[in-house]
Amino acid sequence: MRDRGRIHVRGIVQGVGFRPFVYARARALGIRGSVKNTGSQVEINAWGDRFETFLAEVSRGPPLARIDSVEVLPLGGS
């Protein structure tokens, strides 16, 4: 199981409360990291014991978002 990753979320993810949604889910699950808008996507660097649960919730997004794709890349560290 992964415990960290760099997540790129593409679709309608800006202006729909996506970053506050990510923050709330991360806080609730004890996930650490960062989230930022980068052009037409949101980039999340995240790590923690419940990373897979966090990834599943982020992949669904908040109600106003439309997720077209989610890509998970390795995030350095152990």
Residue ranges and their predicted role:
Residues 1-78:
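Intrinsically disordered, low-complexity, mixed-charge
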